[in-house]
């Protein structure tokens, strides 16, 4: 079993910011999305739609508690990814785990979703 995708639901204007964020920071590409009743986007990493974005209203979702802490991705190219975060003024913190030789970067998207990106075998210089 593996996680297929994450879905972020937000008002349309915020969703456009979130779409831009994932496309520019993560390099995801907007692709095919079935003709669902509501609007949204599927963002692809290669041939996999890993981030789904859907338009939601302000009222019911705002009242629902959210216990999701963060979503984690694994990547390569730590230095280039840090440069991308700097270029887009994304504040982040880093953590190195020597026992497994992995650097982690933690930050949030414009909707406030906590994100972690892991870089096995790479260390902040």
Locate each region found by the language model:
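Exposed loop/turn and edge beta-strand positions of beta-sandwich/beta-sheet ligand-binding modules
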Residues: 37, 67, 101
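Core segments of cupin and vicinal oxygen chelate
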Residues: 9-50
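Mid-chain, well-packed structural core segment of small domains
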Residues: 64-90
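N-terminal beta-strand motif that seeds the catalytic metal site of vicinal oxygen chelate
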Residues: 1-19, 69-71, 125
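Vicinal oxygen chelate
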Residues: 87-125
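Short, conserved turn/kink motifs that form compact alpha/beta structural patches or helix kinks used as
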Residues: 50, 56-58
